[in-house]
Amino acid sequence: MRTQTHIGVMMLLTCLSFIPGSFGKEKETPKPTAWGYVRGQGVEARLQTSGNKPALTRLGHGALVTVLDPGAKGSSSSVRIGAVDPATLSPQTGNIDLSQIEIMPLDKFPSDAELLRLVGGRFLDDLIAAGTTVARFLLRQGDQPPALLCLLGGSDLPYTQLQVFLPSRGKLVAGPSLNFPTSEMQVGLASVEVRDLVGDGNECFISREPFSFGPESGGANYLIRRIEDGELKVLWKVPIEFRNLALFPPNPEVAEPPEDNIGAPGTISRATIEFRARGNVSQPVWKGKVEFYVFGREKPVQSVSIERVCPWDGKKFAPLR
């Protein structure tokens, strides 16, 4: 009798799990209620991807996130958001301080599906569109309405697309774009930052972009771009990591000027970029070191340190070399 009762209870629970509104129903993903524009110097937030523990993530100035619902109960200063990591294009969720974002209405910007239709081409395919993740950034354009810059990509796509949407008659239209092969980029850009470097209100888009010339040669470039006359213009491009161990010269020699050693055979170069104010302009500074290697030795035989300020000439920043 007990066995029959147990079987009956299990059958009842199984049936209830398929009834709408029953306790067997899976929790629905929260729907966006607004947009959140990350302002100021950006924000450090504890976000998590699906199934992972929360990790400290930096949301840079200019990032556009979705507001999902209020954060912790009883805390009016906390809000739950959805964001996309530009390096992996993986969706993340978590709580941040409400004071660190500017709330914008949901109808101010098109949905992801609407943006993909504006781009057209391969994104009109339903399967491709469903597997595409969109990371968003706002670029202020002086007195003009801001432009929307998006990273479009996914693990099954051959390249990640950097797509600009320009304001036109109160709407957004697809503007210039760049493609990055996923064989080099993995999925997204290693880092993204938005800053007004020139002081005219026309914000720049700063990115760290990996490159590869083979298993023993590759690194990452640091690029500063901004929108001018409806196009993405490169204002500065320098390597901040450059490993070239495909060849080793028999007798390494330090070239002059020192920056000419960056990327030379048998060297590893690493640098950080700082910005120094000069009037209204923030000038980039390349600070790093080039290490020289010989075949068969793990440690460098010599190194040279470099620090170079690259001033603004009115159109672009001076090249490193």
Please annotate each region the language model reported.
Residues 24-30, 34, 53, 62-65, ...:
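Acidic, small-residue rich beta-repeat scaffolds with periodic aromatic anchors
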Residues 56, 86-87, 151-156, 183, ...:
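Short consensus segments that form the blades of beta-propeller domains
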Residues 137-153, 196-211, 271-289:
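Acidic/hydrophobic-patterned starts of short beta strands in beta-sheet-rich repeat architectures
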